């Protein structure tokens, strides 16, 4: 009986898949898809996408099949993967509006009010209005400048907390959680107002974000194979996302006051008469895109500095030369430190926080390299592959901040070409809305921590691990644990 049931189930699955394939075949046959690895029935190229991280696998496949190739996630869900800067520029910049649609797993509807936020919604009046409201209000330059003293206060408190924690653990600690919560505080003031001071909220958002990252790794299989929606593992993921979303609602709802300060994101959201669901989704999005992109990138940078003491001391000297050792580094100093900027860029080159960017979808019939691309075609840009092109970045797997310093071009490559090929925040009309704030907070955090502490291996002679976690964003498999020594004690 059980064997018969298994046969019936398998037959239904195969028939369903073939029916879907036949249904889709008419829509995809009118377009000449770029060549790619040979696909198998039903599963497409899924058998070739395991093992290493997704962006690494695709970068290796591009070396064989070309920098513009088609990958089939399931036999009826093709996507074009671009691993070349010129083609990426055509998609992201030159034909930005043609490729400005989005392609997200169904599960993301739960936390985005049915894709009603900046990152998930297709381009159009709603998207333009929401993006303009964020950038022109909470993230307006003068409003960000008004945060400088509070950022510096937060950093002073963070350094004190880190020193106290490390002193109880033989000088060793993990910096990631400290930097995440520092970023949550900054973003909360921009969303709700400068009077924000709720550590329970900070801890709650931190936990919710960690849970969403953990769950995100299971999100896409059911999009490739709809019958997977009934698998217990997928149902569990759906249930967990609903639970996290409910926790976020309970955290944010008490802050949905009628008259928030005029320079906050909440003021703009209220002015648009959005539902609470859309407002909470927009608030969560700021944390979701802003916290890990800032904190995790700073920790990647610290990891490289532990592994490269020469670079760390060169950066420390630049900071002290600017401050004279008479004061702490300030937020406004970030733009005055060229080697700091080079370290930041080299970290984002080697470890872009979104190595496959956010998936794009064509909003109309268009073209790529002169060939027709149908409306609704999924596009992914492999930023990791672009950032590791040896023709642009000599010795691409080595951490060399000097490549981004003016005057070093002859030794490390064409700096103009390298700058154009560096796309950690994507490019074009869908470039990250919070890019400038993210770079500022990232740079200030990194400079402050290098100024305050000397960072060394937690265990003498054992360099920190650079392994990557296999998820949508580029996190460390084993977050940095390092020994910190206050510079005042050296």
Curated annotation (Swiss-Prot):
One of its GO terms (molecular function) is iron ion binding. The chain crosses the membrane at residues 2-22. Pathway: Alkaloid biosynthesis. It is an enzyme of class 1 (oxidoreductase). The keyword Heme applies. It is found in: Endoplasmic reticulum membrane. This is Cheilanthifoline synthase.
